């Protein structure tokens, strides 16, 4: 159950079609914002600064927008599943000590993975380590540092006892490599940088993993190669679901299986619909002669043209989540050059998508077969009046997934992503991230060879630009964004690095140093102060707190506050704990710095038996 559950942070278990949980991680980051301009500009997905409260803007299940409540509920469910194993494993007869310890180690992994998420998304939270026999309503919050100490100890045990993937009969279950990755993050979060580097050294040099540097596996030609041709390349192959978990992929450390046709084996993942642009919007995107810009012709329609079948080639996006300009352009600059040779940002091979790669396909238009234009060449008027939702670049190699149900239906006018019977296998950890974690550890240690680890990832992507001097933490986080889009939990990682910077005393790329006692206890929407997370979101993302944007006939004002580094502790959890008091996060209603907390995990564990 734990292994199946972990994939539901990426794709929602009930297959809601317009959003998925992982998108919340990008909304609260430098890489994306909410794009549904057909909803009210007062929606909390736009107005995070004022709309996100312990009782408002806090969704667990909805078709659009963020899933903050989902992360709280499902993460404690994951902890419950892990604790079930840990609570009852002694009652299982016939297990030798190695097998028993391997199961304990796997359970520790799932619990540690969950608490790593909780402490960097919610701050200080209740520590639950056992299955209770009756309701407990007097929890205290446990301080983040104490929880990190506990999960670090647990992961040291897990690395010792969980077997390598090569010695496991099951793909997608916890393995030693995955445990090392999580332990490295635990060491970074507890200021043990040399130990973090050592774990990454083992992964990179001693366990049989290697970066994939040439084409491999099965070549997937894409949705319609006559419309959108793909030149086979290693980055394209690396991110095809059919190649992620195969034995020849030496880069995979730990993956998540999502394929088949049953609810246990497969959850649909409509990536193209959710993360792709609304290129066929009939009201807001026109050709210069006033016709609809893009049409989603079915294959049995007389207007269909296989050379202009963008429906199958790139899917029918609705722009629920829009990448920031930074994610589309700025972050791809190294040495002052936007590196379009980089296979991850390369439209020539078909990996990267730009609106000007799409062609008008409305029959009767004088612009039929010509490339999309943002402005009318005759008068410079905008041809797209909803540039938030309809007009942006996207990483096609990441979001393209075959829609096998639509492909089997010649009348289909929706191609959304992985559908029932298809594949959406995903990476949890791969070796490229180990290089970037090692670079981060070296940064804190003042080791100039951090640039070599970043450049190893860039060299594999055939980048024209490499780093030549000392890399900053910003360079490392930029490379994470380029390499790990829709893999990493971006908000959580920015929050983790914000804490690591404060612990280390190192300055960020903006020249700021942070105090561990104050970095996460600030509020306001101005540029003064705030955490590293806030600086990245506002300065790099460059959409939040920048004033009004007009799109689709409405004025949108994206706002986010310094205190939104952490999500609020949900009011339902506070009310349910009516014999005790949980610490609410700074900046939200109910914050009280005098609230008692556990400052070590041992006392918190002892208290679990009290009612």
Residue ranges and their predicted role:
Residues 315-455:
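C-terminal substrate/ligand-recognition segments
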Residues 3-10, 14, 32-122, 138-146, ...:
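Conserved, well-structured interaction surfaces
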Residues 3, 61, 75-76, 150, ...:
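Long, intrinsically disordered, low-complexity segments
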Residues 148, 193, 447-448:
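TPR-repeat structural position
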Residues 1-44, 187-373:
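An aromatic- and glycine-enriched ligand-binding surface/loop that stacks and positions planar moieties
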């Amino acid at each position: 159950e734990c292994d199946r559950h972990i994939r539901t942070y990426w794709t929602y278990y009930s297959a809601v079609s317009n959003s998925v949980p992982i998108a919340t991680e990008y909304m609260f980051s430098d890489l994306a914002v909410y794009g549904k301009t057909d909803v009210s500009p007062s929606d909390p997905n736009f107005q995070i600064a004022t709309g996100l409260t312990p009782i408002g803007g806090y969704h667990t299940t909805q078709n659009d927008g963020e899933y903050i409540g989902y992360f709280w509920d499902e993460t404690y469910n994951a902890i419950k599943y892990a604790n079930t194993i840990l609570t009852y494993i002694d009652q299982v007869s016939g297990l030798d000590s190695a097998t028993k310890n391997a199961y304990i180690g796997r359970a520790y992994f799932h619990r540690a993975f969950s608490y790593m998420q909780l402490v960097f998304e919610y701050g200080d939270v209740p520590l639950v380590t056992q299955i209770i026999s009756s309701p407990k309503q007097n929890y205290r919050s446990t301080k983040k540092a104490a929880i990190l100490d506990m999960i670090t100890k647990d992961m040291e045990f897990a690395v010792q006892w969980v077997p390598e993937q090569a010695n496991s009969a099951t793909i997608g279950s916890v393995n030693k490599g995955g445990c090392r990755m999580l332990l490295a993050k635990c060491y970074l979060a507890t200021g043990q940088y040399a130990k973090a580097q050592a774990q990454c050294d083992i992964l990179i040099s001693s366990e049989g993993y290697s970066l994939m540097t040439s084409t491999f596996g099965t070549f997937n030609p894409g949705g319609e190669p006559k419309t959108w041709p793909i030149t086979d390349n290693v980055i394209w192959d690396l991110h095809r679901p059919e190649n992620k978990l195969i034995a020849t992929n030496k880069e995979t450390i730990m993956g998540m299986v999502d394929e088949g046709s049953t609810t246990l084996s497969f959850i649909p993942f409509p990536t193209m619909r959710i993360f792709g642009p609304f290129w066929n919007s009939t009201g807001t995107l026109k050709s210069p002669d006033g016709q609809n810009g893009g049409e989603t012709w079915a294959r049995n329609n007389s207007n269909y043209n296989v050379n202009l079948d963008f429906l199958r080639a790139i899917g029918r996006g609705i722009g629920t989540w829009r990448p920031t300009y930074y994610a589309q352009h700025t972050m791809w600059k190294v040495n002052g050059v936007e590196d379009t040779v980089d296979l991850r940002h390369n439209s020539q091979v078909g990996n990267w998508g730009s609106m000007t790669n799409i062609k008008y396909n409305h029959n009767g238009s004088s612009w039929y077969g010509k490339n999309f234009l943002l402005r009318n060449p005759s008068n410079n008027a905008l041809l797209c009046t909803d540039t938030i939702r309809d007009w942006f670049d996207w990483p096609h190699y990441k979001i393209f997934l075959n829609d096998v149900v639509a492909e089997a239906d010649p009348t289909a006018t929706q191609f959304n992503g992985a559908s029932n019977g298809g594949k959406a296998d995903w990476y949890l950890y791969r070796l490229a991230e180990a290089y970037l974690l090692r670079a981060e550890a070296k940064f804190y240690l003042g080791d100039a060879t951090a640039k070599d680890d970043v450049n190893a990832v860039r060299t594999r992507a055939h980048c024209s630009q490499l780093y030549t001097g000392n890399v900053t933490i910003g360079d490392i986080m930029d490379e994470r964004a380029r390499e790990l889009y829709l893999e990493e939990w971006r908000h959580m990682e920015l929050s983790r690095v914000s804490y690591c910077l404060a612990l280390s005393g190192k300055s960020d790329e903006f020249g700021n140093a942070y105090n561990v006692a104050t970095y996460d206890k600030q509020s306001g929407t101005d540029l003064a102060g705030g955490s590293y997370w806030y600086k990245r979101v506002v300065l790099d993302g460059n959409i939040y707190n920048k004033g009004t944007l007009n799109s689709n006939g409405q004025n949108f004002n994206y706002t986010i506050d310094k205190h939104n580094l952490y999500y609020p502790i949900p009011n339902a959890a506070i009310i349910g704990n009516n014999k005790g008091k949980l610490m609410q996060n700074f900046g939200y209603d109910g914050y009280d710095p005098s609230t008692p907390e556990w400052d070590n995990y041992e006392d918190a564990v002892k208290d679990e038996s009290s009612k």
